[in-house]
Curated annotation (Swiss-Prot):
This is Uncharacterized HTH-type transcriptional regulator HI_1476. One of its GO terms (molecular function) is DNA binding. The lineage of its organism: Bacteria, Pseudomonadati, Pseudomonadota, Gammaproteobacteria, Pasteurellales. Residues 24-43 bind DNA. Pfam families: HTH_3, Peptidase_S24.
Length: 239
């Protein structure tokens, strides 16, 4: 069965979610979080290579159709075995690498607060990957293996960082320097803020100062504060 108009990835995911009787069942069978599925359906993120393979296996579609929308949705007896399909997916990924694109682990399930703080429970593994130009990474002076991608939630860093902006974070840059922007964690809360060392602790400073005053962390709490990494690039939506 051909789906000639299924050339939009969010539409294909929407179709497969419906095919499995809704997001909850889709999440249960694929092992993907509901928040990640929501981002796929909205077109805010793309699945990793391993998730593409898992979705194809669970839903009975080919990886080619899932990735491109240009071939038959239903598998047939004339199709090559699954191993060949997986090989093709790896070949396409290799082609991207040869073209100067690196795939960087992303954490769409982590709620990074550009506000007053967020709660994230037990989230430590990446749930996707995002492509970044090697030329851009070189210009930023960072290495793909040291980076991860997160998304901002809130308006405290306006106008520098908008709500839902994609942030490239260098996880190797944990030393506080100047008024640079960092991802910081205190317990289960993760913020994106400017970080300033004070004589009695640390101040987390928002760019939207009128609505979000500095957060002072002192004493033992300051010692427990962890610098996840420095934000080195921000991706704004134009719509």
């Amino acid at each position: 069965m051909q789906y000639q108009n299924q050339d939009n990835f969010p539409e294909r995911i929407e179709y497969l979610v419906d095919k499995l009787n809704g997001p909850s069942e889709f999440a249960r069978k694929t092992g993907v979080t509901l928040s990640t599925i929501t981002r796929w359906r909205k077109g805010e993120a793309d699945p990793s290579r391993s998730n593409l393979v898992k979705i194809a296996e669970v839903t009975g579609v080919s990886i080619e159709w899932l990735a491109t929308g240009k071939i038959k949705e239903e598998k047939t007896t004339e199709e090559k075995p699954a191993g060949s399909l997986v090989s093709r997916a790896f070949e396409r990924m290799q082609a991207m690498l040869e073209e100067g694109v690196s795939m960087i682990d992303s954490y769409s399930s982590i709620n990074v607060s550009a506000g007053f703080g967020s709660f994230n429970e037990g989230i430590t593994q990446p749930d996707g990957q995002e492509p970044y130009s090697d030329e851009l990474l070189t210009s930023l002076g960072v290495k793909a293996d040291n980076c991860a991608v997160f998304w901002a939630n809130g308006n405290s860093m306006l106008p520098t960082i908008n709500n839902y902006d994609q942030m490239l974070v260098d996880l190797s840059r944990k030393e506080i320097q100047g008024d640079r922007i960092y991802l910081v964690q205190n317990g289960e809360s993760v913020w994106v803020k400017r970080v300033k060392m004070e004589w009695d602790g640390i101040s987390l400073i928002s760019d939207n100062k009128e609505e979000y005053p500095p957060i002072s962390i002192t004493g033992e709490n300051a010692q427990n504060l962890q610098i996840i990494g420095q934000v080195v690039h921000i991706g704004h939506s134009l719509i």
